[in-house]
Amino acid sequence: MKKILIPALTAALLCSSAFALETSVAPKVTDIKNHSPKTGLIVGNSYSFYNCGVHSYLRGLTRENKQDWKARIITISSGCLSYHDVEQYMGPHEMDPYAKKDEKGNLINPMFDVVILQGMSTEPIAEKSIPTFKKFLKQHVATIKAKGAEPIVVDTWARQNKPEDTKKLADAIITAANENDAIVLPVGLAFAE
């Protein structure tokens, strides 16, 4: 799995403009502002956690690039974006090791440089959950930006028995991210390759 995921994440991070050719929707945001983030929060579900967790692979990539990086992962099994309290996650909290302080010792934002948001695998395309997905993606992206961090929305991969959902997921997630001026990490498209 590691041999597949590291190249996929690397390709997704470096070649995000390439996925416009494979979807009906072109991404509005094609680059992150902070090219050297030092802290990250990953908000997701079991897709984010299992197989050593996305945070472990990102840590491996950043170590290979000799880049300082620490990440926190908060996942809920089968969790939709609406299950997460991103406002609370963004702190800062007094005893939190990720909390940043100014020269006087006061807690400051952002606690994280980037926040990676991953919805449940069918959430962006299941008719019943689309409105909630869009509502909470908008709310979470606004919260992340207000706290001084940069949101990154994951284009999740289709379930193994539904490969035809790859394009549907990409189109739905890119559309929702575009509506909120957020970049998409095209992991689902990279896995499909």
Model segments located where?
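Generic cytosolic/nucleocytoplasmic N-terminal low-complexity/intrinsically disordered segments
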Residues: 1-2, 146
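N-terminal secretory targeting modules
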Residues: 2-67
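Residue-identity detector for threonine
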Residues: 4-6, 10, 23, 30, ...
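Aromatic-enriched hydrophobic runs in primary sequence
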Residues: 5, 11-14, 43, 57, ...
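Alpha-helix boundary/interfacial micro-motifs
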Residues: 19, 61-63, 68, 130, ...
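Conserved SGNH/GDSL esterase-like catalytic core that processes O-acyl groups on lipids
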Residues: 39, 48-129
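Alpha-helical cap/lid subdomain in secreted, periplasmic
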Residues: 100-193
